[in-house]
């Protein structure tokens, strides 16, 4: 297996250059579809049936593929996303580049590299005849970087028919996978008061910005009392138009994270209580939002799956580890359904969402070999 993977390293780099050099920001539907078509062509060549769904009002391209009959359980689901955070035109400014150790470019780590790890694993399994014994589903969406609003139900529907889910977000430096992620969401606070001349008759005003200031302190107090299970941070505040006018409107955006499913209810109850506890007479407060991504908590099935990864890695002489992270991924949705889920199947890399994002090219062969070896073991255990 390793010799075959080694022989295709130049092909992998060529594929990586091709995908990275496609602008595919979440609002660039044509770019996302171009990524999908690249993958569809290759998946069809190894016997996968493919379908490009257009989801939501915007028609977000989402690719599904499988090597078995539709409607049946799959042994493994490969999950990833084709969109990036970078705006259209970014590729022209800083296209794919590589030296002996690293590759750079828009989305190279998050997660064009991961898409290609998934593809090349499947091509290795096809070459070794494993796909005859193993059913694999592929779900690559096009809106993960903007919350997966159009594709969440689609992901969950496929995850329910999967025995395991491998998520191809980046692997962390030190070859660390992800077994646990915080859940997340957001809330918006809108305060409405009364404007007045700030110098002549401020007493006639009801200052919406002051109300938001009070609510910000209340949120921080909740954050301090949550005991690490949940966090809420005011990240954006807007209010007022001119310095001599008492503002009649103000708004705050709040980022929320939860460690456990049991942390969700207290967060929701706290934010729902805020409109009844205003501080500035004459100001009303409305709150909207939710915890939109459940936390990813490792269960017994996930830990057993991780043990298989450790075993195969040890046979390769590869040292791997796992971490918990505060960032969310679409793996949260699968894990919340009780499906054993491991994330970080992409290339080892870092600085995601930054202009100096990179992947370590030395991780290409071991990552493909490890995942393919795990899949081969799963196939053998079915016999």
What is the predicted role of each segment?
Residues 86, 102-116, 197:
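Glycine/serine-rich anion-binding loops at beta->alpha junctions
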Residues 111-182, 379, 383:
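Acidic/histidine-rich catalytic neighborhood of metal-dependent amide-processing enzymes
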Residues 7, 24, 54, 170-171, ...:
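Metal-dependent amide/peptide-bond hydrolase catalytic core
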Residues 79-80, 139-141, 166-169, 190-192, ...:
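Short beta-strand segments
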Residues 75-77, 103, 163-167, 188, ...:
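Short glycine-aspartate micro-motif
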């Amino acid at each position: 297996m390793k010799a075959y993977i080694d022989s295709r390293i130049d092909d992998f780099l060529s594929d990586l250059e091709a995908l990275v050099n496609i602008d595919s920001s979440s609002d660039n539907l044509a770019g996302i579809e171009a990524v999908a078509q690249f993958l569809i062509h290759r998946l069809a060549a190894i016997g996968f049936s493919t379908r490009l769904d257009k989801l939501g009002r915007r028609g977000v391209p989402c690719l599904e593929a499988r090597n078995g009959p539709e409607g049946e359980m799959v042994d493994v689901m490969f999950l990833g996303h084709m969109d990036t955070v970078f705006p259209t035109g970014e590729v022209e400014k800083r296209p794919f580049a590589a030296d002996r150790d690293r590759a750079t470019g828009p989305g190279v780590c998050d997660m064009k590299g991961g898409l290609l790890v998934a593809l090349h694993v499947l091509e290795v399994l096809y070459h070794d005849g494993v796909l005859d014994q193993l059913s694999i589903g592929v779900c690559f969406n096009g809106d993960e970087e903007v919350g997966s609003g159009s594709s969440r139900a689609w992901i969950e529907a496929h995850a329910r028919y999967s025995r395991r889910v491998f998520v191809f977000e980046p692997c962390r430096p030190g070859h660390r996978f992800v077994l646990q992620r915080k859940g997340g969401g957001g809330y918006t606070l809108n305060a409405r008061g009364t404007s007045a001349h700030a110098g002549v008759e401020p007493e006639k005003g009801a200052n919406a910005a002051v109300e938001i200031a009070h609510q910000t302190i209340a949120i921080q107090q909740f954050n301090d009392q949550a005991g690490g299970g949940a966090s809420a941070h005011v990240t954006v505040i807007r209010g007022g138009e001119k310095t001599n006018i008492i503002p009649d409107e103000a708004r705050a955006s709040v980022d929320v994270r939860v460690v456990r499913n049991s942390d969700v209810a207290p967060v929701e109850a706290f934010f729902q209580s805020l409109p009844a506890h205003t501080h500035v007479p004459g100001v009303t407060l409305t709150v909207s939002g939710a915890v939109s991504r459940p936390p990813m908590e490792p269960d017994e099935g996930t830990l057993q799956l991780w043990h298989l990864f450790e075993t195969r890695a040890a046979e390769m002489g590869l040292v791997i580890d796992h971490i918990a992270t505060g960032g969310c991924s679409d793996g949260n949705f699968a894990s919340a359904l009780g499906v054993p889920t491991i994330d970080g199947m992409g290339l080892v890399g870092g600085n995601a969402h930054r202009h100096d994002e990179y992947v370590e090219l030395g991780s290409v062969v071991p990552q493909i070999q490890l995942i393919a070896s795990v899949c081969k073991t799963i196939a053998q255990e079915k016999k």
